[in-house]
UniProtKB/Swiss-Prot annotation:
This is Phosphoglucosamine mutase. It comes from Anaeromyxobacter sp. (strain Fw109-5). One of its GO terms (molecular function) is phosphomannomutase activity. Activated by phosphorylation. GO terms for cellular component: cytosol. Its cofactor is Mg(2+). The gene is glmM.
Length: 469
């Protein structure tokens, strides 16, 4: 049985088990444990405690998306940080990769993003970046978690109360949006423009509602901006990367050359070609990876993907002399493998794309700019470029569960998975894993017969519901 990170072909270390932190920070329903103001304050204190190193005046950047609860959590975590004698710099609504960029460029000691990414507005989350713009390693998150939960280092942590003259200050960052827009435009080749192109941009009423339209307009495109009026409750509501259908329809209505749908914090993107056909993260990795191979700029001719990526990605890259290295699910693990092994491009099927020569984390706008650069350089539409990727049929079922028992402790589930794997043989694969952000088990079956694999995925899901539901 291939279960989570133990799936064949994966590299790197298994994620460290933690109680608060998932694969993308701490996440939950706003104002319900652990996503409360009290917890945010303690997380801020613990982060400030961990990053204090040296005698300089320490600073931490805080950004957020457009959720109603962002105001509450922003003030709470800022209070926790400043109570430890560390200054706070507030960006307001800005994409997650924008906070990573500002953290590094402003020489801050850490960055904080308040967002639940593609989740509905009722949820929120808190994730941390180190001073170099990369997500904090699992081990550092564990250290923060232990401080918050009272498991280690308590005496010094609780005793550290700076005097009134040493309490941290908080201030707004001047033109955070403008700084990030300038950076994104610098990624696009200087000898190219977007003149003559019409682009549909779905911002999901999220953090990129100012940034994304500005970038493409300033590079010369005519922009059809969708879902750019956040009200605190409409983020990701029937729009954005999880619901790209309206973006695809707008392409046909406006006869656009390309469409892109971002999620709430704009760290992922789903594209659609000029005919309104969806182009997901795997297809983007295939076409961009092949282009980088042609340009001789793909490090070690390797793209880093996760165990969820389609087998069609491996075949598309193999046809151009490239290969795929797989990791556990989560863009943080893709980035860790890229840094560890010297790779420069990778991502996830869901649309997290990391161009490590330019950015430190998934960046939806940067990914779209890289695809547009290929289109302009080659003089070919996205529909033609995306033909290099032929997906193998996949069936994905998400099973809501009440408990997270090890799958190895569920003999009937193991028996059904083994039976399906035997039936698939070398023409497919099975992946069963717990979600890192939700109380769900994800069942993925890949094979040549779409109807058959759907039935097989449902069979496994039914057994999981009996055992854990």
């Amino acid at each position: 049985m291939r279960n989570g990170t133990s799936a064949n072909g994966t590299t790197g270390h298994a994620p460290i088990a933690r109680r608060l932190f998932g694969t993308d920070g701490v996440r939950g329903v706003a104002n319900v444990h652990p996503m409360t103001a009290e917890m945010a304050l303690q997380l801020g204190r613990a982060l400030a405690y961990v990053v204090r190193n040296g005698s300089h005046r320490h600073r931490i950047v805080i950004g957020k998306d457009t959720r109603l609860s962002g105001y509450m959590l922003e003030q709470a975590i800022a209070s926790g940080i400043s109570s430890m004698g560390v200054d706070v710099m507030l960006s307001g609504p800005l994409p997650t990769p924008g906070i990573a960029f500002l953290t590094e460029s402003m020489r801050a000691d850490a960055g904080v993003v308040i967002s639940a990414s593609h989740n509905p507005y009722q949820d929120n989350g808190i994730k941390f970046f180190s001073r170099d713009g990369f997500k904090l390693p699992d081990a550092v998150e564990l250290q923060i978690e232990q401080l918050v939960l009272g498991e280690s280092g308590l005496e010094e942590f609780h005793a550290l109360r700076p005097t009134a003259t040493r309490i941290g200050k908080a201030k707004r960052i001047d033109d955070a949006i403008g700084r990030y827009v300038v950076f994104l435009k610098s990624i696009f080749p200087k000898d190219l423009t977007l003149d003559g192109l019409t682009i549909v941009v779905d911002c999901a009423h999220g953090a990129a509602y100012h940034v994304a339209p500005a970038v493409f307009e300033e590079l010369g495109a005519k922009v059809i901006a969708l879902n750019v009026k956040p009200d605190g409750k409409n983020i990701n509501d029937g729009c954005g990367a999880v619901h790209p259908e309206s973006m695809a329809k707008a392409i046909q209505k406006h006869r656009a050359h390309l469409g892109l749908a971002l999620d709430g914090d704009a760290d992922r993107v789903i594209l659609a070609d000029e005919q309104g056909r969806i182009v997901d993260g795997d297809a983007i990795m295939a076409l961009v990876g092949r282009d980088l191979i042609r340009q001789k700029t793909l490090a070690k001719r390797t793209v880093v993907a996760t165990v969820m990526s389609n087998l069609g990605l491996e075949r598309a890259l193999a046809g151009a002399g490239g290969r795929v290295v797989r990791t556990a699910v989560g863009d943080r693990y893709v980035v860790e493998e890229m840094r560890r092994s010297g790779y420069n491009f990778g991502g996830e099927q869901s649309g997290h794309l990391i161009f490590l020569d330019h950015v430190t984390t998934g960046d939806g706008v940067a990914a779209a700019l890289n695809v547009l650069a290929v289109m302009q350089r080659e003089g070919r539409p996205l529909s033609e470029l995306a033909r290099c990727f032929e997906p193998v049929p996949q069936a994905l079922v998400n099973v809501a569960v009440k408990e997270r028992r090890p799958l190895s402790d569920l003999p009937e589930v193991a028996r059904v998975i083994g039976s399906v794997e035997k039936a698939l043989g070398k023409d497919g694969r099975v992946l069963v894993r717990f979600s890192g952000t939700e109380n769900k088990v994800r069942v993925l079956v890949e094979g040549t017969d779409g109807k058959r694999i759907r039935a097989q995925a449902d069979e496994i899901a039914d057994e999981l519901r009996k055992a854990l539901g």
